[in-house]
Regions:
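Histidine-/acidic-rich catalytic cores in large beta-rich domains
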Residues: 1-118
Length: 118
C-alpha cells in the first residue's frame, strides 16, 4: 500500500492486506518487521496503510480496516513497543487510510497559520 525511504537509507513498506510493516535495506535484507500482531500486545495488524518516521526514530503506522478492537493508528519503537494508540472506531470506523502527524518546524508552521484563520 505504501512505502517510504527512511533517514538511514532503508525502505519502510506497509503491505496493505499483507498485515505487515517491513523495513528493507538497500541490499534487500529484511532488518525489521511486524506481521499479524504486534508482539506482546493484543493489537492485530490488518490493512497496513500510511507510514511516518518520527524525529525520534519511531514509526507511526496506519492500521485501516482493523475493527473496533484495534487502533487505527499507533506509534511503535524499533523494539516493537507501542508508544500510543489512536482508536476512535466510533468516529472513523474502518475508513481511516491516510493521516499525518505534525511535529517540529512543520507543526509550528501549521499552528501559526491556523491562528491567523478567523
Amino acid at each position: 500500500y505504501g512505502a517510504m525511504r527512511l533517514k538511514n537509507g532503508n525502505t519502510l513498506i506497509a503491505s496493505g492486506s499483507g498485515n505487515s510493516v517491513v523495513e528493507v535495506s538497500p541490499e534487500k535484507k529484511v532488518v525489521w518487521e511486524i506481521k499479524g500482531k504486534v508482539p506482546g500486545t493484543e493489537v492485530n495488524l490488518k490493512w497496513m496503510t500510511c507510514l511516518q518516521e518520527r524525529e525520534n526514530g519511531n514509526f507511526i503506522v496506519g492500521n485501516c480496516h482493523a475493527g473496533p478492537d484495534n487502533p487505527q493508528i499507533f506509534e511503535i519503537t524499533r523494539d516493537k513497543k507501542i508508544v500510543w494508540e489512536f482508536n476512535e472506531f466510533e468516529l472513523v470506523g474502518n475508513g481511516l487510510a491516510c493521516w499525518q502527524v505534525l511535529e517540529g518546524e512543520q507543526a509550528a508552521m501549521v499552528s501559526k497559520k491556523l491562528k491567523t484563520l478567523k
